[in-house]
C-alpha cells in the first residue's frame, strides 16, 4: 500500500470504531471485554489467524470467529461477508499492521488442516477442470497474464493485505469473496463464505506469508 491515506478501505475500517463500542442486545460491546480500544487490545491477534479453534472444532479466520463470537458475547449478529463483519475484521487486522504473520503450522490440528487446504488448492473442479494451482503456482500460470489479469504466485504469499479495497469494484473484499470470485471463471459453484474448505484453503495460503508484516487494508484493482 504505497499511500494508505488514499485508501478508502482505511476510512471504512475506522468507521468500525462505532460498531466496536456499540452495545448489542446482550448489553455488551466489543469494548467492554477488550479494554484500551481495538488498536491496543487487538495488537498481535490477527497475525495468528486463520487457526484451529478447539472450542469450535474447526479452522477459523477472523471473519469466521466474529460470526460466532459476536452473537455469543454481544447478541449482535455478525454474518460473514456482512458489512459490519468486514469492517470489524479490517479494524482488528489494522491493529496488527507491521506485525509478522505467524499462523500455526506445527500442531496436529494445523497440520491436518494444511493437508486438506493443500488438497483443495490442487483439486480440479468445474467445467474447465482447473485447480487453484493451475493459475497460482510458478511452474504453471503464476506471474503471467490471463485475459488482462495478472495471476499472483500463491507460494510468494498474497494473503496479508486482505481485506483489500478493490478499485474495480469500489468496495472492500475479504479473502472469501476473492475465492468465490475466482470460482466463477472456473465454471463451478462457489461454496458458502463460512465453509470449512475455504477456511482451510485460507490457512494453507497464509502459511506462505509467515514472517512477513501484515498490511491491511490493501488496495488492488
Stretches found by the model and what they are:
Residues 1-9, 22-32, 40-86, 94-98, ...:
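Electron-transfer interface patches adjacent to heme c in soluble/periplasmic c-type cytochromes
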Residues 11, 109-112, 196:
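Alpha-helix N-cap/N′ positions at the starts of helices
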Residues 12-22, 114-123:
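Short, intrinsically disordered, charge-biased short linear motifs at domain edges
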Residues 91-95, 114:
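Basic- and aromatic-lined ligand-binding clefts that recognize polyanionic substrates
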Residues 99-116:
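Solvent-exposed, charged amphipathic helical/linker segments at domain boundaries
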Amino acid at each position: 500500500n504505497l499511500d494508505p491515506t488514499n485508501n478508502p478501505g482505511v476510512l471504512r475500517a475506522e468507521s468500525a470504531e462505532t460498531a466496536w463500542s456499540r452495545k448489542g442486545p446482550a448489553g455488551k460491546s466489543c469494548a467492554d471485554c477488550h479494554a484500551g480500544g481495538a488498536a491496543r487490545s487487538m495488537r498481535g491477534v490477527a497475525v495468528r489467524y486463520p487457526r484451529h479453534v478447539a472450542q469450535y472444532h474447526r479452522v477459523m479466520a477472523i471473519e469466521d470467529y466474529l460470526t460466532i463470537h459476536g452473537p455469543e458475547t454481544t447478541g449482535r449478529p455478525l454474518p460473514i461477508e456482512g458489512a459490519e463483519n468486514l469492517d470489524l475484521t479490517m479494524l482488528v487486522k489494522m491493529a496488527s499492521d507491521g506485525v509478522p504473520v505467524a499462523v500455526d503450522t506445527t500442531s496436529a490440528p494445523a497440520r491436518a488442516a494444511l493437508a486438506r487446504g493443500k488438497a483443495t488448492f490442487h483439486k480440479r473442479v468445474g467445467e474447465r477442470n482447473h485447480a487453484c494451482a493451475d493459475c497460482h503456482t510458478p511452474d504453471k500460470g503464476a506471474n503471467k497474464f490471463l485475459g488482462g489479469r495478472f495471476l499472483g504466485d500463491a507460494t510468494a504469499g498474497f494473503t496479508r493485505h486482505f481485506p483489500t479495497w478493490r478499485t474495480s469494484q469500489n468496495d472492500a473484499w475479504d479473502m472469501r469473496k476473492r475465492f468465490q470470485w475466482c470460482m466463477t471463471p472456473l465454471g463451478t459453484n462457489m461454496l458458502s463464505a463460512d465453509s470449512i474448505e475455504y477456511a482451510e484453503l485460507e490457512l494453507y495460503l497464509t502459511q506462505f506469508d509467515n514472517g512477513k508484516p501484515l498490511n491491511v487494508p490493501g488496495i488492488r484493482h
